[in-house]
Amino acid sequence: MRSLFYIAVAVAVFARSSAVAAFTNADDSQLLSKTTPDFATDAMASSDSRKRFLRATDPEDGDLQADDEERTKFKSLADIIKHLDDQDMKHVAGILANMDDIHHKNVLAKALESGRITQKNYDDAIAALQRTSK
């Protein structure tokens, strides 16, 4: 492994000395050796790390307020239901209020399809869910 490294270093040194010898003027060889560091400096200067923003902040769009967007977070499902009730979206609030029942019915349906429970057990569980939800 070391011999491979030494061969690579020797090839790099030989290639550099051959490129320097190819120039007739000594200033030209200095130009070649300065090309890479200046290029690296230019690349670093042009790739300034800029802070990225997800939303545009144009002063022309002053009419868009944060209240117009759905940025608010709610702590619980009860807060979401209350907020929907306030906005006269009773049907959506009803769906969210019955989300547990809907989930239980879906789980029971999957269990019935896979054969883990019988039709009688499924019917009994649905009847029990309807009694508890009233």
From Swiss-Prot:
The keyword Signal applies. The keyword Cell inner membrane does not apply. Disruption phenotype: Results in significantly reduced virulence on Nicotiana benthamiana. A motif (RxLR-dEER) lies at residues 52-71. Keywords: Secreted, Signal, Virulence. It holds the Pfam family RXLR. Residues 1-22 form the signal peptide. Belongs to the RxLR effector family. This is RxLR effector protein 4. The gene is E4.
